[in-house]
A protein has these predicted regions:
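Short, flexible micro-motifs
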Residues: 11-12, 110, 188
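Active-site beta-loop-alpha junctions enriched in small/polar residues
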Residues: 3-7, 30-32, 66-69, 107-109, ...
Length: 226
């Protein structure tokens, strides 16, 4: 999955991916560190879909990423509501662009809730997003994390615990991030570490939920949690 950076309309992301010979790509559909996002300009969605067809990028090989501000596990009800509203906007935008996947970080309890309660809130948030985008084919894709602080998803089992509480199972999936896995303690610099990750993903989550992979280098050593 090649992460594309671009300026101007979102259709430029397709051109950027094609220029480097990517076969799949990820992108942000809005500024990743602000809550506000302008609507798509007229014609941009049609341009995006036409360029995807021209360069042979089917929807399942494009993985847009959610804002870093979104936190479905937040102990702050106001922030959770803003997060849900933002995700609904993003899911609608995905549908306008003909996309079928939307990647998010599960969130953080900020040290004020139990992990069990955080997992429940994430699943509840996903369920609300699904209900508010009824009839959409866009999946919420949960990404594994690096076990930093109170973030959820560093333990692969937590991803499955969230999925277990999601009502529309056909609209949820998982993205496996190799940098996050390395930071969480899987030493992917060795065959043994890679094998351990694969075995634990199979037993704790299940390959049937995997819809994307972020293949990233890690600046820190295994288990650095960053």
């Amino acid at each position: 999955m090649f992460q594309v950076w671009f300026s101007g309309g979102v259709h430029h992301a397709v051109e950027a991916a094609a220029r480097v010979g990517a076969q799949s790509f990820g992108l942000f559909l809005r500024p990743q560190r602000t809550w506000q996002a302008p609507p798509l300009k007229p014609g941009v969605a049609d341009q995006f879909k036409a360029l995807c067809a021209e360069h042979n990028f089917p929807p399942h090989l494009i993985l847009p990423h959610g804002s870093y501000l979104v936190n479905l596990a937040s102990p702050n009800p106001e922030l959770r509501e803003k997060s849900i509203a933002t995700l609904v906007e993003e899911m609608v935008r995905c549908q306008q662009l003909g996309l079928t996947l939307f990647n998010i970080h599960p969130g953080s309890t900020c040290g004020k809730l139990s992990r069990q309660e955080g997992i429940r809130l994430v699943a509840e948030g996903v369920n609300r997003v699904h209900r508010e985008t009824k009839g959409s084919a866009v999946k919420v894709v949960l990404e594994n994390m690096c076990r930093q602080g109170d973030t959820l998803g560093g333990d692969l089992e937590e991803l499955k615990l969230i999925i277990d509480q999601v009502e529309e199972k056909e609209r949820v999936g998982v993205c496996l991030d190799t940098c996050h896995a390395m930071a969480a303690g899987y030493d992917l610099s060795t065959p043994e570490g890679f094998e351990r990750l694969c075995c634990e993903f199979e037993t704790k989550v299940g390959w049937q939920w995997l819809v994307g992979v972020h293949i990233n280098d890690s600046l820190g050593p295994a288990g650095s949690h960053r």
